[in-house]
Amino acid sequence: MNSKIYIVGMGPGTGEMMTPQADQALCGSDVIVGYPVYLKLLGGKYREKEFLSTPMKQEVRRCEMCFEEAEKGKTVAMVCSGDAGVYGMASLLYEMSEAHPGCELEVIPGITAANSGAAALGAPLNHDYCVISLSDLMTPWELIEKRLAAAAMGDFCMAIYNPSSHHRADYLKKTCDILQKNGVEPERACGYVENIGRENTACEVCTLAELRERQVNMFTTVFIGNSRTKIIGGKLVTPRGYVLPDPAV
């Protein structure tokens, strides 16, 4: 029988936004592996489980721990914030699994920040959209610039992950400049959400020009509307294109 590793997307971090399938996988695991912040967010519900963690930038070691525990006959869960297949650990575990043919992997989907953040703001992704991370840790900034420019020229709505950090404090400002250079007007409707799904969640709707001057952190997801996105009752809304009835009729 194959050893089992669940790759679990835990959503924003609160139990209410974790799927029943994710909860079932965690309850059925002997060992839960993850970044310390994510393990802390799980709270006390799984305290009878064995928790293993590594700090940031030790993701490969974290995956090795999963295989080591699974090969001892334990059922293992690797937890990721949001969805494990969206800037998560799913692809790395699959790449490493070639050296561990006796381990069976199963991805458990979670609610990613693009979806949970969009819900908090209204309906900003109701048409074609793309997700772009501003982290240049593993992607050259020059390539990120090309993707931002292409999204702007294609009039996509955008969900921007990892908009800032201590070492990338000006990246959101640079992003807004790139978008304006490629046809996005300063008045474009935008928004952002900090600490999605947690007690101190904060949302703001603004223009691109206003967004350029905002200070955000690594727990923020930024939303850029397309040319038809508008603000309705304080919410960010991208029309799907339906023909509305004439209110005068």
Where are these regions (language model features)?
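Class I S-adenosyl-L-methionine
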Residues: M1-L105, S116, R212, A248
